[in-house]
Amino acid sequence: MIVDTSAIVAIVSGESGAQVLKEALERSPNSRMSAPNYVELCAIMQRRDRPEISRLVDRLLDDYGIQVEAVDADQARVAAQAYRDYGRGSGHPARLNLGDTYSYALAQVTGEPLLFRGDDFTHTDIRPACT
């Protein structure tokens, strides 16, 4: 299973639906996050003026067994195509941001479902980890 930044932010922030996301992570034998999404997650936590939480990101990923995966050339191409087709400014209702395209790409290249929060990915052809 591929994990988008939005899923971890929802868990840390205690958003509605966070329990479902936690349970999906606990059930998953192999969870991965794209390296740019890891950076995005750290930046979001830091921006929220909660440095204590930003320091816990690595521990949280370890607790859930989420591996950070480097971006390869295939993923980069798929991410670029996703931004073209689904990105902000494309006119598509998904309105993916740049970080979203890396989660999308890793899920597409690996064929794994994507764990996310929100409705942006529901407007794409990605397979969700939770319905």
From Swiss-Prot:
Signal peptide: none annotated. It comes from the Bacteria. This is VapC ribonuclease Mb2780c. Its EC number is 3.1.-.-. Mg(2+) binds at D4, D100. InterPro entries: PIN-like_dom_sf (IPR029060), PIN_dom (IPR002716), Type_II_TA_system_RNase (IPR050556), VapC_family (IPR022907). HAMAP family: VapC_Nob1. Toxic component of a type II toxin-antitoxin (TA) system. An RNase. Belongs to the PINc/VapC protein family. It comes from Mycobacterium bovis (strain ATCC BAA-935 / AF2122/97). Residues 1-125 form the PINc domain. Keywords: Hydrolase, Magnesium, Metal-binding, Nuclease, Toxin-antitoxin system. Its cofactor is Mg(2+). The lineage of its organism: Bacteria, Bacillati, Actinomycetota, Actinomycetes, Mycobacteriales. GO terms for molecular function: magnesium ion binding; RNA nuclease activity. PANTHER family: RIBONUCLEASE VAPC2. SUPFAM superfamilies: PIN domain-like. The keyword Nuclease applies.
